[in-house]
Curated annotation (Swiss-Prot):
This is 3-ketoacyl-CoA thiolase. PROSITE patterns: THIOLASE_1 (PS00098), THIOLASE_2 (PS00737), THIOLASE_3 (PS00099). Its EC number is 2.3.1.16. It is an enzyme of class 2 (transferase). CDD domains: thiolase. SUPFAM superfamilies: Thiolase-like.
Length: 387
């Protein structure tokens, strides 16, 4: 079986969905920009040598519809002979794209794959056109389709207080802002064209979603967003709405050697699991455990974790049950997470994997794990190993 390596991993800045930098930029353009960038950064790879493109996207309608992977590839002037497929596992879409490509390479059905994902939540809202089958209520609580209420459920089940959530959210913004100021994101962000507040076209090389002024005190003034009577989850402790894309270049280790490209990391293991939709945010726990089992590792072997911050009330129970509460500041989301950067649904799996690989390089870490919860009760995880 072929070893799968990550040769490159990049992303756009995260733009604010409401009147943000990418309000006049389409999702296909964000995607095509990264596809072109990966090729220009790795000139020994001919675009025609790409065997397939896997691109995550959740709301596949309007500008994100009709196979956005193919539309973006055509915009990027990738040869018509290169196929492209749009992948949807809700929040885990672009990590699923990574898994699909990795399996193709492992089995020898592909040698080179370009993967990634995008979501323009400003142009295509998360709830656009969603129409749940009424019969689902026989098997699943209606509230299980409301992500904020599933976070409230986890908070109650695991004793996660409002103060704990506010502290974690403030940490996310503080860490993301510190990473921005120190240049820690520079290696992963590709400057991307957008418009400033006055409508002037400019190049953005920073995440505009981060709120550096965020403190526990300011967060404590916010009202519950989903359960106004007894709730503890607020907009401030939920992932921000943002627009963005992320992309990675995968290939077999032997193909990388042929092309003279230096692998940055190896895919060590992958896992996807299901869980009760009412606690969908708990999915990273069984997914991470399964990925670690497949890799022959334990949580203590992992040097760095990237766990998608759908909600503070969701990620804290996962950290607790993975036995990592005492290691948050040493191992988990060291540059902040989706509470500060946002969670463009189809982008996030590739985004956290990209951030993880860059973080592993900075810390000279051997193993890293990226994981995320998925709406309606799933979890997905990937273990990476530095090459």
């Amino acid at each position: 079986m072929e070893q799968v390596v990550i040769v490159d991993a990049i992303r756009t800045p995260m733009g604010r969905s409401k009147g943000g930098a990418f309000r006049h930029v389409r999702a296909e353009d964000l995607s095509a920009h990264l596809m072109r960038s990966l090729l220009s950064r790795n000139p020994s790879l001919e675009a025609s040598a790409i065997d397939d493109i896997y691109w995550g996207c959740v709301q596949q309608t309007l500008e994100q519809g009709f196979n956005i992977a193919r539309n973006a590839a055509l915009l990027a002037e990738i040869p018509h002979s290169v196929p492209a497929n749009t992948v949807n596992r809700l929040c885990g879409s672009s990590m699923q794209a990574l898994h699909d490509a990795a399996r193709m390479i492992m089995t020898g059905d592909a040698g080179v794959c370009l993967i990634g994902g995008v979501e323009h939540m400003g142009h295509v809202p998360m709830s656009h056109g969603v129409d749940f089958h009424p019969g689902l209520s026989r098997n699943v609580a209606k509230a299980a389709g409301m992500m904020g209420l599933t976070a409230e459920m986890l908070a109650r089940l695991h004793g996660i207080s409002r103060e704990m959530q506010d502290q974690f959210a403030a940490r996310s913004h503080a860490r993301a802002w510190a990473a921005t100021q120190s240049g820690a994101f520079k290696a992963e962000i590709i400057p991307t064209g957008g418009h400033d507040a006055d409508g002037v076209l400019k190049s953005f090389n920073y995440d505009e979603v981060i709120r550096p002024e965020t403190t526990v005190e300011t967060l404590s003034t916010l009202k519950p967003a989903f359960d106004p009577v007894t709730g503890t989850v607020t907009a401030g402790t939920s992932s921000a709405l943002s627009d963005g894309a992320a992309a990675m270049l995968l290939m077999s280790e032997s193909r990388a050697r042929e092309l003279g490209l230096k692998p940055r990391a190896r895919v060590r293991s992958m896992a996807v699991v299901g869980c009760d939709p009412s606690i969908m945010g708990y999915g990273p726990v069984p997914a991470s455990k399964l990925a670690l089992k497949k890799a022959g590792l334990s949580t203590s072997d992992i040097d760095v974790f990237e766990m998608n911050e759908a909600f503070a009330a969701q990620i804290l129970p996962c950290i607790k049950d993975l036995g990592l509460m005492e290691q948050i500041d040493e191992k988990i989301n060291l540059n902040g997470g989706a509470i500060a950067l946002g969670h463009p649904l189809g982008c996030s799996g590739a985004r956290i994997s990209t951030t993880l690989i860059n973080q592993m390089e900075r810390k000279d870490a051997q193993f890293g794990l990226a994981t995320m919860c998925i709406g309606l009760g799933q979890g997905i995880a990937t273990v990476f190993e530095r090459v």
